[in-house]
Amino acid sequence: QVEEGNTRVENVSELEKELEEKNPTHVISLIGRTHGTYEGEYIGTIDYLEKPGKVFENVRDNLFGPMVLSLLSKKHDFHFTYLGTGCIFQFDDEHPFGEEKDGFDESSLPNFFGSSYSIVKGFTDQLMHLVEDSVLNVRIRMPITDEFNKRNFITKITNYEYICSIPNSMTVLPELLPYVLDMMKNK
């Protein structure tokens, strides 16, 4: 049985009460801020978080929220799954462009700090390692599905004026999610 949470994560005491009442075996965090409306214009990418005054939302939704869920899950012995991001890495000497033979792994530290989003998510990723005995940290990149949806990466790029041709990682959600469920079951 799957239940959606009703409490905003910044309301920690109410969230803890809801978790205690529902008493789940697993908690899954799909929390994250990558888009929003700024001055009446919808911005569907992390460019939204680069706008003035968006630090609060970025930290609340991309750091505080997931960490609150992970800490409450640990406290109450619920397995916690965090869908984080791989947008915290860039090519470097150990991972040269065009030579994808040795990728980043679970122990890799973030090395991309080119956006507010990546900085905050990079620190969230590092903090998740402090509770890794009770956390499954899944790093996804540019999620795609076969559905037409404004949050689907394929749908997004059809609206871009320019597209660069650089090899990159993408997450095919219908293929990934069964593996995530298996990993959650096997904790």
Question: Where are each of the predicted segments found?
Answer:
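A short beta-strand-loop structural module common to alpha/beta enzyme folds
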Residues: 1-9
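NAD(P)H-binding glycine-rich loop region in Rossmannoid oxidoreductase-like domains
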Residues: 9-63
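SDR active-site strand-loop-helix element
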Residues: 30-31, 80-86, 138-140
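Catalytic helix-loop patch of NAD(P)-dependent Rossmann-fold dehydrogenases
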Residues: 51-65, 87-138, 145
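Conserved cofactor-binding/catalytic machinery of classical short-chain dehydrogenase/reductase
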Residues: 64-68, 79, 123-124, 172
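A short helix->loop->beta-strand "cap" motif at the edges of active sites that frequently abuts
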Residues: 75-78, 133
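NAD(P)-dependent short-chain dehydrogenase/reductase
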Residues: 114, 126-182
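Core catalytic loop region at the nicotinamide-binding pocket of NAD(P)H-dependent oxidoreductases
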Residues: 183-187
